[in-house]
């Protein structure tokens, strides 16, 4: 189950929802059909990829998906195995989410970054045409050190 921590004095899950982020826990090997059909249109529901994200090498923690970015698509991703860490930009500061097997991440337009803590297998789905990728655009936000845990 996703472990979420963030700036004190706010309802972090409510703030995540306001910026387009939601997590649910659904043990199994894929996101629940009800979630997929709620978020993606019929022609977008196919699995785009199954990937294993490896922890970054020392000094590369802020490169690629480890850089603050916004994806051009709406994402519905399922974690099959492993642990990883995400951070999301909220108006009150960054919040940290540690994710593991069974977590479903739904993101639409939120600024975030991702770091696998161990090899982590993902089932990737997102909006857009069949040939579309995530359309990641780095935001240039300062790459502060990653927290040790959520």
Question: Model-flagged regions — what are they?
Answer:
Residues 54-61, 71, 78-80, 88:
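Long, positively charged binding patches that form subdomain-scale interaction surfaces
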Residues 1-68:
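A short, N-terminal "cap"/entry segment at the start of jelly-roll beta-barrel domains
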Residues 73, 83, 111:
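Extracellular structured ligand-interaction cores
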Residues 117-150:
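Double-stranded beta-helix
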Residues 85-87, 113, 123:
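General beta-strand recognition
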Residues 99-119, 127-128:
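Conserved metal-binding segment of the jelly-roll/cupin
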Residues 68-71, 116:
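Residue-level marker of regulatory loop/turn positions in helix-turn-helix DNA-binding domains and
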Residues 76-101:
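A short beta-strand-loop-beta hairpin characteristic of the jelly-roll/cupin
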